[in-house]
């Protein structure tokens, strides 16, 4: 079972979303004023996401991979394919924010992407390998940034302006969030 950083407010007792299968580690909530230690912890979480995801799906059968993690939710296979889709977007957002002046980024419809045939027909190992390669590059980029670089901003058309500290925290949480969908399903099903 994956472990999660206690830095996420959603991990605190009393979070009403902790019993919601959609948010097994709670909702994302950025912490106050990130420190170098917080950034390093987030980078380590991102760096380790591919290995934790690979462990989370190890040994699952085709039928198990096609099982939704909750009623009305994505299948385990769709969750696996979603992670590189989403994290590719995050990686590009980091690059835009570092190379352009407060760019407006393009959102994508994650549900529509998850419903495309590649999420159904592609073996999960393809996305696991893609995520490993992506995170190897992304981690190099993240570790190369100076503290002031994390103040670079971008605008999301739906949620407004954000800095790279916020994006770093979000994607540190995001990988753990989806891995917990899989590990909590395995626990509930006795897999």
Language-model features: where?
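Short, contiguous alpha-helical
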Residues: 2-4, 8-25, 29-30, 66-111, ...
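Short, charged, low-complexity loops and linkers
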Residues: 28-44
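Acidic/His metal-coordination segments adjacent to aromatic residues that form catalytic metal sites
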Residues: 34-38, 76, 113-127, 157-166
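Alpha-helix N-cap/loop-to-helix boundary motif
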Residues: 38, 45, 71, 75, ...
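Acidic/histidine-rich alpha-helical segments that form the ligand environment
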Residues: 41-56, 114-151
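A glycine-rich, hydrophobic loop/mini-helix early in the fold
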Residues: 46-74
């Amino acid at each position: 079972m994956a472990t999660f950083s206690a830095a996420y407010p959603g991990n605190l007792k009393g979070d009403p979303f902790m019993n919601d299968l959609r948010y097994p580690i709670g909702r994302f909530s950025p912490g106050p004023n990130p420190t170098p230690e917080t950034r390093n912890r987030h980078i380590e979480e991102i760096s380790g996401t591919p290995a934790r995801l690979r462990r989370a799906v190890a040994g699952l059968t085709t039928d198990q991979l096609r099982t939704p993690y909750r009623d009305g939710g994505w299948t385990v296979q769709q969750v696996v394919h979603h992670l590189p889709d989403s994290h590719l977007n995050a990686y590009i957002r980091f690059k835009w924010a570092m190379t352009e002046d407060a760019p407006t980024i393009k959102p994508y419809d994650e549900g529509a992407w998850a419903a495309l045939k590649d999420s159904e027909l592609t073996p999960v190992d393809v996305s696991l390998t893609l995520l490993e390669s992506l995170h190897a590059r992304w981690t190099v980029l993240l570790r190369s940034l100076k503290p002031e670089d994390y103040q670079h901003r971008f605008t999301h058309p739906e949620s407004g302006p954000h800095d790279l500290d916020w994006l770093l925290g979000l994607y540190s949480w995001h990988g753990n969030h989806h891995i917990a969908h899989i590990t909590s399903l395995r626990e509930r099903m006795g897999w």
